[in-house]
UniProtKB/Swiss-Prot annotation:
It is linked to Reactive, secondary amyloidosis is characterized by the extracellular accumulation in various tissues of the SAA protein. These deposits are highly insoluble and resistant to proteolysis; they disrupt tissue structure and compromise function. Belongs to the SAA family. InterPro entries: Serum_amyloid_A (IPR000096), Synovial_Prolif_Regulator (IPR052464). Gene3D superfamilies: Serum amyloid A protein. This is Serum amyloid A protein. It comes from the Eukaryota. Expressed by the liver; secreted in plasma.
Amino acid sequence: MKLFTGLILCSLVLGVHSQWMSFFGEAYEGAKDMWRAYSDMREANYKGADKYFHARGNYDAAQRGPGGAWAAKVISDARENIQRFTDPLFKGTTSGQGQEDSRADQAANEWGRSGKDPNHFRPAGLPDKY
């Protein structure tokens, strides 16, 4: 009986362990997807494309699974919260402009995380590379 109980306990622990490893792997790959979208946005430097890159990064990350979706939300929320403080300092935007843009960014983030096509936000003329 003790052997049976021990085997059950070990299998449960190992099962939970593998789920966490999968989650963290998805989160890591999702963070890389977010970084790739950010890097592409900086490289493209295309006016009006930021919402597309927000949606694309979140979409790609969420496709990895729950860990990727979690990473996308954490990174997106952190980015928006940081910008809330840095934009007035470095860009001179007023709080109304910053809040409006932040809400639009968060809508694009959620659009992508929910599995909807990020091309909805793709501006005309953005090179096919992106």
